[in-house]
């Protein structure tokens, strides 16, 4: 059984070096892979400065992994609004209350912010904060890895033929090679 199949590592970069964290894949289409976050967070600032990112889907229970390299671009405001509207209310409150990645005195200060927002939006929809939205990772490289006995793994690397991002459903845009374990 696969625990969180949509859990993925997003690796970004800044002047201090690489940074990685787990986020949830919230959608994909022929253009790429979508996740949502606070765009003022460390990852949001890193993406704004260096939009080339890596994703890893670590499916340990199946001895499989998918690795993606691509360019992160903001999704439209409409896509962000639509997704925010279907999030659980508690998640909406948390997104609106959090200055993600910024220091805070203690948990009580954050909890007070959430309570204030609950009171302010009592009986009303919570508006999506301007700083909260999605990114679509436009892939230019995807590797599929399958673990095998004695570390004789199977690996296939798909690379866009022109080196730029390519549509996932355009087979002619991708070249494929088998890699040694």
What are these regions (language model features)?
Residues 1-181:
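Binding-site signature for planar aromatic cofactors or substrates
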